[in-house]
Design a protein with these regions (language model features):
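C-terminal segment of N-terminal export signals and the immediately downstream linker at the start
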Residues: 18-49, 153
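Short, conserved beta-strand element in jelly-roll/cupin
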Residues: 71, 85-99
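Histidine-centered catalytic micro-motifs
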Residues: 79-85, 123
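N-terminal export signals
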Residues: 2-24
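Ligand-binding loop in jelly-roll beta-barrel domains
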Residues: 118-145
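Acidic/histidine-enriched, glycine/proline-rich intrinsically disordered or flexible terminal extensions
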Residues: 153-184
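Short acidic-glycine-tyrosine-enriched beta hairpin
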Residues: 104-118
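A short glycine-rich, His/Asp/Glu-containing loop-to-beta-strand
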Residues: 44-80
């Protein structure tokens, strides 16, 4: 047997064993239910006129998926942005929204779904006068759960230079703002 191969085998076996362990690791050993209007961890997150309830945490899926249910009273939404590493998905429960993905804008109502691939600029805005509600999903979750928690805190403790603070927060979490919020 080749001596180099013999010496490399234990190292390779260790790396493969660690990788297999990480792929099979699951933080949720059983299913769970999160009731309507409730957050998975009883946290209260309010961001830009919307309440965000975590339904599936990145901790539940080893970072594979994150789902928020957002109820929005006010019109509008976030600035045009993209994620380096996450796809973002939108499922409308009630109300009307406009969702832009790349150069295309879609008017969405209850039951409609939109997919925004990673690295493609996108944004949404609630356009209806009545309350709006949608599921916002990220795959993989990446740093998005932490982003939402920090955004909520930023709204409670507004810095003097909000534009700079937002740019830094987006950048730290793998996103880039590339335009203003949608006009509707």
């Amino acid at each position: 047997m080749d001596r180099r191969l013999f010496l490399q085998f234990p190292l390779l076996a260790s790396v493969l064993a660690l990788q297999a362990k990480n792929q099979s690791k699951t933080n949720s050993s059983k299913g769970f239910v999160v009731r309507s209007g409730k957050d998975r961890y009883q946290e209260e997150l309010y961001i830009m006129g919307g309440e965000f309830d975590c339904k599936v945490s990145s901790k539940d899926t080893d970072g594979a998926l994150l789902i928020y249910d957002t109820v929005r009273e006010t019109k509008g939404g976030p600035a045009l942005h993209f994620h380096e590493s996450q796809d973002e998905l939108f499922y409308i429960i009630k109300g009307e929204f406009i969702v832009r993905v790349g150069d295309d804008a879609f008017n969405l109502k209850a039951g409609d779904f939109a997919f925004a691939p990673r690295k493609i600029p996108h944004a949404f805005a609630k356009t209806s006068d009545s309350e709006g509600q949608m599921l916002v999903m990220f795959q993989p979750a990446g740093l998005m759960e932490d982003f939402f928690k920090q955004m909520s805190q930023l709204g409670k403790n507004i810095p003097k230079d909000m534009e700079h603070a937002l740019k830094d927060l987006f950048s730290t979490h793998g996103m880039q703002v590339v335009g203003p919020p949608l006009k509707y």
